[in-house]
Regions:
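Active-site core segments that coordinate phosphate-bearing ligands/cofactors
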Residues: 17, 76, 83-100, 105-142, ...
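A short local structural element in Rossmann-fold oxidoreductases
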Residues: 55-57, 80, 275
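A generic structural motif
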Residues: 1-2, 70, 147, 269
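N-terminal glycine/serine-rich phosphate-binding loop of ATP-dependent small-molecule kinases
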Residues: 1-65, 93, 121, 176, ...
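Active-site donor-binding loop signature of nucleotide-sugar glycosyltransferases
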Residues: 3, 180, 256
Length: 297
């Protein structure tokens, strides 16, 4: 299911969290209908999705603003602010990464700096897949692989960093409970069951960020294994049973979907996204021809 990307200014990238949820509901219902699988046979499900996006909810659980997603580049000043307050080396020692515009923390500080009225109303911060989880279960939860990309997690110890949050004056109550990827975080709510066709007895586990989930699916779950993906972004991903942090912050280190393990990644943000931009801006005739033939351009 394709949904819009909003770019109100050059270098900005936003999506509506509601679009993700509606896409998830439609897809789940379609899969159950076409497969003929009895809902009672769906014992559990895990959730995966794009990482780093900032979803802000008010006290009633309503979305406060469109999500600033992973490829948004507006937060360079906030990255400098983080390094100035925390120190680059200390930040890497805690989060295993330097401050980056793609990560959630700098996006949160941008909202605090530029949209204080929105920040003041915020009571919950979620990642994209975890917003879908919340809508399916009513639970505010995340898991270690995706939380690693928020830049508020103590990656070596797999928990929120109280030290970092205190230094940046961020209320820890805004953050969801952190689980391991394989742990149960809740079950399908009555409302979501009616919309999706799933059973209320279906358990929902932590799941993983997109590439961490792909690693499990491709068997990259032990030392010496790696893979490369070309999706919206491009990634080279390697599993490690021992924590490995680049002190210069040249590659990402995140908690792995496998409990007690981590992974390192090299990333380029513009792979498939660049191809989509080229298609949408320079291939209009080809898109029209594909539509006439009933093909995906």
């Amino acid at each position: 299911v394709e949904y819009p990307l909003y770019q109100p200014h050059n270098g900005w990238a936003e999506q509506k969290p509601e679009d993700w949820y509606h896409a998830a509901v439609d897809t789940i219902r379609s899969v159950l209908t076409k497969s003929g699988v009895d809902k009672k046979d769906v014992v559990s499900m895990g959730i995966s999705g794009q990482m780093h996006g900032l979803v802000m909810l008010d006290e009633a659980g309503n979305v406060l603003r469109p999500s600033i997603i992973w490829c948004d580049q507006r937060t360079a000043a906030e990255c400098d602010q983080i390094h100035e307050i925390v120190g680059r080396d200390q930040l890497i020692s805690i989060t295993a990464n330097p401050a980056l515009t793609g990560f959630t923390l700098s996006k949160l500080l941008w909202v605090r700096n530029h949209e204080p009225e929105v920040y003041a109303k915020c009571r919950h911060i979620l990642l994209p897949k975890d917003y879908v989880r919340y809508m399916l279960t009513g639970d505010f939860a995340t898991e270690v692989s995706d939380a690693s990309g928020m830049q508020m997690l103590d990656v070596p110890n797999r928990c929120w960093s109280e030290k970092l949050l205190n230094m940046l004056n961020i209320d820890p109550s805004l953050l969801a409970k952190v689980y391991e990827s394989c742990e149960v975080t809740g079950h399908i709510s009555k409302a979501a069951a009616e919309l999706t066709g799933l059973s209320e007895d279906t358990l929902v586990v932590g799941g993983a960020g997109d590439n961490a989930a792909a690693a499990v699916g491709t068997g990259v779950v032990e030392d010496g294994r790696a893979f490369t993906t070309i999706g919206t972004s491009g990634v080279v991903f390697a599993h490690t049973d021992k924590l490995a942090i680049d002190p210069k912050g040249r590659v990402h280190t995140f908690c792995c979907a496998v409990p007690g393990a981590w992974h390192v990644m090299g990333v380029t943000q513009a792979a498939g996204l660049s191809l989509k931009w080229f298609r949408d801006n320079f291939c209009m005739a080809e898109k029209e021809a594909a539509a006439l033939m009933g093909e995906d351009p």
